[in-house]
Amino acid sequence: MKKNFAGSTLVVLSVGLSGSVYAQSSVTLYGTVDAGVIYSTNQQVTNANGSVSGGHAVQLGGGNLVPSRWSLMGTEDLGGGIKASFDLENQFLTGTGAMLQSGSLFNRQAWVGLGDARFGTLTAGRQYDSYSDFLGVYASSNSWATQYGSHFGDIDNLNEAFNFNNALKFTSVDFGGLTFGGTFSLGGQAGNFAAKRGYSLAAAYNHGPVSLSAGYLSLNQPLDAALGGASGYIGDLSCANAAANYCTLQSASSLKAWGAGGSVVIDKATLALVYTHTRLQNSQYFASAANPGGTGVSFDIAELNAVYNFTPAWTLAAAYIFNNAKVSGGSSTRFHQINLGTNYALSKRTALYMVAIAQKSSGAGLGVDPATGSNVNYAQIPNLVNSNSDRQLAVMAGVRVNF
């Protein structure tokens, strides 16, 4: 999710260097707290005899519209257009107060860097990758549809379910509407430079009401390299929140994705379109005694969304997401998803929201019936336990406060 917050400055210092030249530094605390009630249908339950059934659930969800988190961001003006900066960002669970990832204090970002006003900024540490930065702005889940409205399991990482560890990242300044960036994650394994290595490239062009972006992402051993063997906040594809049917899908030798998107502002309306192609190579989800190496699977995802601002405080929005999943040498499964939402800003920092998400799966089916082993269509709204059928619905209402 994107990180646009109005923070509170804790410290501002001016240190004399020589004559009238001063270095100014600041440290800012910023973040958000988000919570809401979620009603969902058909959450799968495994019975004692191995069969599955479904039930409705009412839950308290935290970090829905925007992940609940806090951050310390610092900058220092070194003069001559050069600035040093850092960001340390922690995500937590609103319902329990626990960290999202045990043992990882700054699980979202931990980086330091230098920026030049003429060229751009180079940063080092754990951080969001360039592909997700440039393309994620066109996904409804990053503005109003909540993380539950993201693409299937956030398989294309537009919601930044996984970040890059041990990464170097460059982001350019605006050159007449053109910006670009790249991220390189060092795997750090002796004797195997490619192990857990990742990189991404992206560019964007903005002119008046029109915005266009394109990017590419490559990550080896994504489950271990970016997620540490556990899930990012989207969840169930990596078994974080429950024993989901799609566990181990991201346990693959590599993940490669590319995409393009754009948006246009027309009076009070904003229209956006984004397309991504993601391929997981040798996914262990498809492994068997006869095929221990796993099988490749690709996802072609297209999203069209629209937001209409009735007033500066009140918006209505809708999105349609189509996802075609194809197993190498095999069959296809299609996921259709509709997101509907409304937001009302009580102030610059506080907003109320209500979102409804419906998903339907069709085709051969990516799910596996635990009792029979046959392929079935199991819908799964991101961050929920997968459905016991080809349909699932979620409705939520909550409040988000930025600080």
Locations of regions flagged by a protein language model:
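Sec/Tat signal peptide C-region and signal peptidase I cleavage site
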Residues: 19-23
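Gram-negative outer-membrane beta-barrel proteins
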Residues: 37-45, 92-98, 130-134, 188-192, ...
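Detector for outer-membrane/organellar transmembrane beta-barrel domains
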Residues: 202-341, 357, 390
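Outer-membrane beta-barrel "beta-signal"
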Residues: 346, 387-403
